[in-house]
């Protein structure tokens, strides 16, 4: 986020200026009393700080450093699959985009670790990751490679290829009825924390920068932390979740 710097020029006063102030009495300045409840919120001007940093037009490029990547954000869906126009408040925040530039990588121990995501790749990233910037009237995001959930080469989330220590899970269907036979609505259904692993990342990096394979594999039924990861819905209506391997609590069999 761009920082705002405020500067003030030094104030100088001549002897004549000081003389002109002679005779000023404190009683000449009066303040009216303020009764409780008389101050309206509209009398204040709010300072709004946006999350996006605006890059001046004179700059022609942005080069991410270290293990960061620059992503051109995919525009939010303005319509549903049925063609219904969505108001701005109902449009979901995009979690995808195209990698347009990458940093030089990072060093772990004595090993140099390059960015594994190439430019041009279509990616899915963590929902609240990175810093948003506006460049050439287009929204971009600068984030760390570790904030990238996976690569998505199609329009269906089920084809996600997770990166690093991410595990991609198809969530088990929620119970439609209670034990007593009462039909549950979508809002009252309890979110399942069990699912089937459909894809895993290559692994996490150890202290020397070497890849350590994940302890779960494709096809495993797992129990995971209830509030972890990023939730997605496939085109067929199925629910998916992408989370870190450390959020998988157990393998069920």
From Swiss-Prot:
Induction: Induced by heat treatment.
Positions of disulphide bridges: none
Subcellular location: Plastid, Chloroplast
Location of region: Cpn-10 domain 2: 159-252
Tissue: Ubiquitous. Most abundant in leaves and inflorescence. Low levels found in roots.
UniProt-listed SUPFAM superfamilies: GroES-like
Record HAMAP family: CH10
Protein name: 20 kDa chaperonin, chloroplastic
């Amino acid at each position: 986020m761009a920082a705002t710097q405020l500067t003030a020029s030094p104030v100088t006063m001549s002897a004549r200026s000081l003389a002109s102030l002679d005779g000023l009495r404190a009683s000449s300045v009066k303040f009216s009393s303020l009764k409780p409840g008389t101050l309206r919120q509209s009398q204040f001007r709010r300072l709004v700080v946006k999350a996006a940093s605006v890059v001046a037009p004179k700059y022609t490029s942005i080069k991410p450093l270290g293990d960061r990547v620059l992503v051109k954000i995919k525009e939010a869906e303005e319509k549903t699959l049925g063609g219904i126009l969505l108001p701005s408040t109902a449009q979901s925040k995009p979690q995808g985009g195209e990698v347009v530039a990458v940093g030089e990588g990072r060093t772990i121990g004595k090993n140099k670790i390059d960015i594994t995501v190439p430019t041009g790749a279509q990616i899915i990233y963590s929902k609240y990751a990175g810093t948003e910037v506006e460049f050439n009237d287009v929204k971009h995001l600068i984030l760390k490679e570790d904030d990238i959930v996976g690569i998505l080469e199609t329009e269906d989330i089920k084809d996600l290829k997770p990166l690093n220590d991410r595990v991609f899970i198809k969530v088990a269907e929620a119970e439609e009825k209670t034990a007593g036979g009462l039909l549950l609505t979508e809002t009252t259904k309890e979110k399942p924390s069990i699912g089937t692993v459909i894809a895993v990342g290559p692994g996490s990096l150890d202290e020397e920068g070497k890849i350590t394979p994940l302890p779960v594999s494709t096809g495993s039924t797992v129990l995971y932390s209830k509030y972890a990861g990023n939730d997605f819905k496939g085109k067929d209506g199925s629910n998916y979740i992408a989370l870190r391997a450390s959020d998988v609590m157990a393998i069920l069999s």
